[in-house]
Amino acid sequence: MSTQRLRNEDYHDYSSTDVSPEESPSEGLGSFSPGSYQRLGENSSMTWFQTLIHLLKGNIGTGLLGLPLAVKNAGLLLGPLSLLVIGIVAVHCMGILVKCAHHLCRRLNKPFLDYGDTVMYGLECSPSTWIRNHSHWGRRIVDFFLVVTQLGFCCVYFVFLADNFKQVIEAANGTTTNCNNNETVILTPTMDSRLYMLTFLPFLVLLSFIRNLRILSIFSLLANISMFVSLIMIYQFIVQRIPDPSHLPLVAPWKTYPLFFGTAIFAFEGIGVVLPLENKMKDSQKFPLILYLGMAIITVLYISLGSLGYLQFGADIKGSITLNLPNCWLYQSVKLLYSIGIFFTYALQFYVAAEIIIPAIVSRVPERFELVVDLSARTAMVCVTCVLAVLIPRLDLVISLVGSVSSSALALIIPPLLEVTTYYGEGISPLTITKDALISILGFVGFVVGTYESLWELIQPSHSDSSTNSTSAFI
């Protein structure tokens, strides 16, 4: 993020921010008052609408279409209630992160802080001398989890794009205009899905060259529109002629609940884009309202799609609800529209990881080589995500494992602990400490359960073909 500019003063042009420190308000940081929350380059900051678009795009698309199966694993009653609780807790943790960042900015006279810096400075407020002396590890840990999570999402997107386009093309000869019957068709074999991934590679590389969030908001808007249209088509189908739900269990067997929990935590992990968006917003005081509005929309979407999808297809629900739709061109287009949305989402997910890794690389080269090194590093990172998608068998489970570890840590474990360390020296109520401890324990349970389930699936060769990449658990 732009905070990296403060760490690497000799590196002038890498950031997505259009305004350099020399172009910032003439008062500089010396006029930064404790009661205000200013930022450099305010004239080039995003509007509230652009911020909302980015927030929706950063959350919708990750695990959304797998939520009906998640509700099945929890039960018709317990599933939606659990999604609501997890959504509330996740949004609360996002609010904690923003609150702590604001508080530390006022205390330290900083214009803005990213996630890693917020944790680092929060640990410096700890009553423990050992923690204060090792506070820099807080930033390193957060940056590591952010990079793993965001690049993991990017790997999944490669597989998602390849699998969906491959399915549409291979079923083209058998696809009809009759959407009343869900008929099984014989697929016409085409090239391997890995070749589809390589086909998308140059286009995603070009997309990753966009380093300005205001420009990315245009692509986010396109992604939101395409996903919005595809979701309307899905809703239009699943609300028709809903079967009698009396045979569906209100509470599923407890042995399948861990599968629900891991999927839900994965779906609600959007905390990585919160501070980057808040730091770029022109009027940051309005960000909490945008955050709660956007996450309320997302939570309602998650609960409704998960519940209605399970009600419509019952025990036959598949890993992606699109696999249950009729084989006609109308619903085949859902895959294409959603794939377009995922394509543009790649840029936003990639942005977070790039702004952590690239500044450290570019700051070590002469100024005349900065742009070349920047673009080369972006190209290499995109190629790495593509190579991982091509080479790693059962990529869905590998990403599930990474997501369970990173998402639980970033979304549920770290923010409550950050609140305790940040406010401990100023007096924090026992009730708040208890609340934060319970949330962190919940996140740790998600970490343990998600990791266990992913590892268990990875060592079970009979569950599916280990040589086939799949995103069925996520799309």
Curated annotation (Swiss-Prot):
Q: Name the gene.
A: Slc36a1
Report the subcellular localization.
Cell membrane; Apical cell membrane; Lysosome membrane
Instruction: Quote the catalytic activity from the record.
Output: glycine(in) + H(+)(in) = glycine(out) + H(+)(out); L-proline(out) + H(+)(out) = L-proline(in) + H(+)(in); D-proline(out) + H(+)(out) = D-proline(in) + H(+)(in); L-alanine(in) + H(+)(in) = L-alanine(out) + H(+)(out)
This chain belongs to the protein called: Proton-coupled amino acid transporter 1
Q: What is the lineage of its organism?
A: Eukaryota, Metazoa, Chordata, Craniata, Vertebrata
What species was this sequence derived from?
A: Rattus norvegicus
A Pfam family recorded for this sequence: Aa_trans
For this chain, the annotated S-S bridges are: 179-328
Looking at the record's lineage, which domain of life comes first? Eukaryota
Query: What tissue specificity is annotated for this entry?
Result: Widely expressed and predominantly expressed in brain. Within the brain, expression restricted to neurons and not detected in glial cells. Abundant in regions rich in neurons using glutamate and GABA such as Purkinje cells in the cerebellum and pyramidal cells in the hippocampus.
